[in-house]
């Protein structure tokens, strides 16, 4: 079994929460992650619910400052955006990065501030899943470089996108979510599964179900990436690690940490235990792991870089 690829989530949300809006430190972290051998750099998305830097704009800067690491969204809400503009942005990003971008997407969690975000963007909440699916179909059609006419939520007549993406067909699309319907959609239509709420045992079962759905759809299930989005607070003092994780989750989401720990997979504790926890995901089939650190980014990056060869 090949070792998993390891990614690093840039702290765009944390920077805004603390009033440190400058982009220079974020770009320095991206460069540092690549120097340490991280395989990918990830950027979150939210307009008003959990404000942060615009992901596509920042991705372009990261692409210009790196040469090897993949760069992706964890995760973008395509339902909030016009898919013709989105296809144009991602084709350009794929060109800037020379084929290193990954389009991680989700339909959005059902919480009040995200519903408010959809209202602020003029998008009906109930339409989010249909908009996401149609937007991705339209993006792929435009990425082909062929003339596109489309009749649906959006109307397109004889449109040709240029430039086309660096990779024929466009960047891979990874989808969050772990419901039965969500994993069926991944298996039938997309290039990767990118959940954030499954322990290793549940992850293995759900990944197998996704691959079954792919085979049933006549697809090569091995061509679909099993990924995971995990949150870490590494500290040799387990109580201190727990306290830091709780403070991080409460400030990030504005909700009680015990509630968030039930929704998202987190680990707080010593480095050796963190290594074993990540290794359990690798054993469960995770091929690409995106790590979100609860503070102390440089120190935790160094720790993970030190033990990743043991995963």
Task: State the predicted function of each range.
Residues 1-65, 126, 171, 294:
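N-terminal beta1-alpha1-beta2 module of alpha/beta enzyme domains
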Residues 1-18, 110-116, 151-171, 238-265:
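N-terminal small/glycine-rich loop or linker at the start of catalytic domains
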Residues 5-21, 79-149, 201-202, 251:
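Flexible, glycine-rich active-site loops centered on histidine and acidic residues
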Residues 6-10, 41-43, 70-74, 101-105, ...:
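Hydrophobic faces of well-ordered beta-strands that scaffold small-molecule active sites
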Residues 8-24, 76-83, 167-178, 232-233, ...:
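Active-site mouth loops of central-metabolism enzymes
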Residues 20-33, 86-89, 175-185, 244-245, ...:
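Short, acidic/polar
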Residues 33, 37, 45, 62, ...:
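Conserved, mostly hydrophobic/aromatic
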Residues 53-76, 131-138, 302-311:
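Alpha-helix-loop-beta-strand connector modules within alpha/beta enzyme cores
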